[in-house]
Amino acid sequence: MFSHQDYLSFVNKKNKMNGIDLFKLIPDKAVKIAFFDPQYRGVLDKMSYGNEGKGRGKERAALPQMTDEIIQQFINEFERVLLPNGYLFLWVDKFHLVEGVKPWLENTPSLSVVDMLTWDKQKIGMGYRTRRRSEYLVVIQKEPKKAKITWTLHNIPDVWAEKLQSKPHTHSKPIEMQKQLILATTQEGDLILDPASGGYSVFECCKQTNRNFIGCDLIFGDDENEQD
């Protein structure tokens, strides 16, 4: 078992490991902000799309899925490792936006939803009625909640249009949107966490903004950084 002093050896690498194991390395109040894109089934279970296991549905279905209990476990750890005033950027789909994410926050009293952004992917996806063209980023802040001293850019709209130039991962996220959020809420050298990194877009943003990254993915990552 690793100890907290070992976590620096995992910084700025594509670690291939379970996110919960990564949390065990990180000491309390060490992370400035975090991104989390949980691999929940959500709308897929409700809609029962026929393309699951075929084409792009095959990629999505192959990813390990997180139960609500596992997601809550991650949220509990975010509360522990975030610095006071730190932000958690939580990606959700339309189903979880409508149903609400508050049950995931029941055991984390110092975390509060303070804002939300919509990512217009400029590409139409699935849907029996309206077709999916967007994803949602819930902005959660750790107490004490403050806006002016923790969010320094004020040109970020709450609807962000960005089409992916390439898609190395089935859940790829917008580089420029995430980069602007990093610039708004952190300083150079700060530590940024993504324990379900997927295509490692947050890592790329950190490299472009001179921030330190700590993150991992259970499936994706460099084999030389794989942890049992």
Swiss-Prot record:
Q: Which UniProt keywords apply?
A: DNA-binding, Methyltransferase, Restriction system, S-adenosyl-L-methionine, Transferase
One GO MF term attached to the UniProt entry: N-methyltransferase activity
Q: Which reaction does it catalyse?
A: a 2'-deoxyadenosine in DNA + S-adenosyl-L-methionine = an N(6)-methyl-2'-deoxyadenosine in DNA + S-adenosyl-L-homocysteine + H(+)
Against Pfam families, the record matches this protein to: N6_N4_Mtase
Matching Gene3D superfamilies, A to Z?
Vaccinia Virus protein VP39
Q: Is Calcium set as a keyword in this record?
A: no
GO BP annotations listed: DNA restriction-modification system; methylation
The family database entries (InterPro entries) matched by this protein are listed as:
DNA_methylase_N4/N6 (IPR002941), N4/N6-MTase_EcoPI_Mod-like (IPR002295), SAM-dependent_MTases_sf (IPR029063)
Would you identify the family this protein belongs to, as annotated? Belongs to the N(4)/N(6)-methyltransferase family.
Q: What is this protein called?
A: Type II methyltransferase M.HhaII
